Amino acid sequence: MEAIKGSDVNVPDAVFAWMLDGRGGVKPLENTDVIDEAHPCWLHLNYVHHDSAQWLATTPLLPNNVRDALAGESTRPRVSRLGEGTLITLRCINGSTDERPDQLVAMRVYMDGRLIVSTRQRKVLALDDVVSDLEEGTGPTDCGGWLVDVCDALTDHSSEFIEQLHDKIIDLEDNLLDQQIPPRGFLALLRKQLIVMRRYMAPQRDVYARLASERLPWMSDDQRRRMQDIADRLGRGLDEIDACIARTGVMADEIAQVMQENLARRTYTMSLMAMVFLPSTFLTGLFGVNLGGIPGGGWQFGFSIFCILLVVLIGGVALWLHRSKWL
């Protein structure tokens, strides 16, 4: 592959443009630099920025069918080989505090042995790990190592989020054992997060597996083995997601049963209260008809005696219900 001039890649509003020094570090790209396989370049762009969008649309370094994909058209994880280059779309956990983590961020990458072009709109939190390693001089030394480190960081963040969801399910199961029902919508949100993760992480696992099996010229055998390990690790995370989805279904049935039992218990209590007060209600209604005058109305102790009789009647009914084991 021919060398590339630094001036052909230096985009003014790029998030960053670095050259890998081959020793695990980076340096800012200069217009006078020469980009080749021994000194590859990583260009990271926000495709909504004006200069970045214009560069993506006009640069001759990218194949025509790659431009739209890097500009935000591709969202589902996939990998496509295009001559000497490879187009990769990946999804990662959203690290923004203003949005839910399951609203995944898309990152698109086109790379060959000398050039890495990655684009995004929202910040890709997992890239901070790779950037930190490069700034400390302990990062990848070539394009293949860069791709493996990025996929490893993405999988680490996905695994952490899956573990958080798993912990929430365990807490929810413990609360259900204590007859504590979660707030309305909590289980639905948890299930949605699991389903969204399953939807995007399954094809991403396939992307990793294909990268491990493809004989890409800029990936070594050791890097392919590492990529296969990453695919296997994400596969175990998907198995955990499937188990969690099944457990949320069981918990939904358990919550419905607990709510039904609580409703039945309240209905039963109200029925018993109605049974206790039914005789007293009948007597007060009968005396209140007042067609022939209220019995005992002219006696000064009439009302007191009537109240005592009502208390005795209510107590008798309650005692009968208790002995009948209804109370």
Swiss-Prot record:
One GO BP: zinc ion import across plasma membrane
Compartments (UniProt record): Cell inner membrane
GO MF entry, a single one: zinc efflux transmembrane transporter activity
Residues exposed to the Cytoplasmic side: 1-272, 321-327
Bilayer-spanning residue ranges: 273-288, 303-320
Gene Ontology CC: plasma membrane
Database matches in Pfam families: CorA
UniProt keyword annotations, A-Z: Cell inner membrane, Cell membrane, Ion transport, Membrane, Transmembrane, Transmembrane helix, Transport, Zinc
Family as reported in the entry's similarity comment: Belongs to the CorA metal ion transporter (MIT) (TC 1.A.35) family.
Name of protein: Zinc transport protein ZntB
Species of origin: Escherichia coli (strain K12)
Lineage: Bacteria, Pseudomonadati, Pseudomonadota, Gammaproteobacteria, Enterobacterales
Gene behind this protein: zntB
